[in-house]
């Protein structure tokens, strides 16, 4: 059963209930930089959310397209708060296509996760849907999610809510 954060027991630095893990999706210089679709405002919102979690509960997901060379180092967005060395790469939209991430979550007894990052119509969407399919309790903070096509995103938001994803905040 998918349920909201009200069912969780962990508290953040402000005493609010949080998920077992925060997954920061694709906050990298390929997408978040001057001249790109997302910029400092999103990075600041993402940093606020990261700062609210214990550092050992923050997981960063980097996207490496299937055609990109593995020896080319991926760079996080300028100014992104890096509090953890838990970094997993993915080569497809969903972060759950990385078996190492799935193993890590299982080994650490994860039952719930919160998603932030980019894009709500792409990799965040795919990862949220995959997490629900894997029977995790899932939440999304829209104030820390980048969305280029907000009209298209309304359908995704409806789908998330209809399958029990806890949605909070407003898009920037």
Where are the predicted features?
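Active-site neighborhoods of divalent-metal-dependent phosphate/nucleic-acid chemistry enzymes
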Residues: 108, 112, 116-121
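Short beta->alpha junction loops
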Residues: 88-94, 143-146
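Histidine-anchored nucleotide/phosphate-binding helix
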Residues: 45-53, 122-133
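Active-site acidic carboxylates
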Residues: 2-89, 102, 107-111, 165-166
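A short glycine-rich beta-strand->turn/loop micro-motif centered on a GG-aromatic cluster
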Residues: 114-117, 135-150
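Structural recognition of alpha->loop->beta junctions
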Residues: 79-88, 148-172
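Short phosphate-binding loop-to-helix
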Residues: 93-101
